[in-house]
Amino acid sequence: MLVNSLIVILSVIAMEGIAAFTHRYIMHGWGWRWHESHHTPRKGVFELNDLFAVVFAGVAIALIAVGTAGVWPLQWIGCGMTVYGLLYFLVHDGLVHQRWPFHWIPRRGYLKRLYVAHRLHHAVRGREGCVSFGFIYARKPADLQAILRERHGRPPKRDAAKDRPDAASPSSSSPE
């Protein structure tokens, strides 16, 4: 039981690295055709980008199936992927992109840091020059803003972190 729990926890942690890599090099690379829908105004309930969730869920289901058929660690790795997917769904789709019927914007703490970091990711038009590709771990918003200024030679014209009044000042109440 303890080993299984440890595998799940380590899988969730590993998924952050895998998700950041996938987001940066696949979604902003050859998978941009799907992911671009996530960087443009949404029309309707779903985005083409949602197909990535279906693919990742398929991998998790396959791991759980193979694991329950005899390769026991795989079911717990699949479980860890599922937990990460749930966290991603709650925070990314619910909190940041407000794809749910309720709308809440964090005003302080780590959730605000996640919120602002992802909004800064969307501050750049297109797939090049973005920051913050992971989601459970987020750098300080001030650091991300400095990277954006360095990459673009100016603050981004579209600073998505300032689209909402309570996210306007990421350095004022963001955790250090």
UniProtKB/Swiss-Prot annotation:
The region called Disordered is annotated at 152-176
Task: Provide this UniProt record's keywords sorted from A to Z.
Answer: Carotenoid biosynthesis, Oxidoreductase
Composition-biased stretches (Low complexity): 167-176
Q: Which GO terms describe its biological process?
A: carotene metabolic process; xanthophyll biosynthetic process
Biased composition of type Basic and acidic residues is found at 156-166
Pathway assignment? Carotenoid biosynthesis; zeaxanthin biosynthesis
User: Is-annotated flag, keyword Oxidoreductase?
Assistant: yes
Q: What class of enzyme is it?
A: oxidoreductase
Q: Where in the numbering of this chain does the Fatty acid hydroxylase domain appear?
A: 10-126
Q: What is its EC number?
A: 1.-.-.-
Alphabetized GO MF terms: beta-carotene 3-hydroxylase activity; iron ion binding
Q: What does this protein do?
A: Catalyzes the hydroxylation reaction from beta-carotene to zeaxanthin.
Which family does the record claim for this protein?
Belongs to the sterol desaturase family.
Please report the name of this protein according to its UniProt entry: Beta-carotene hydroxylase
Q: Which gene encodes it?
A: crtZ
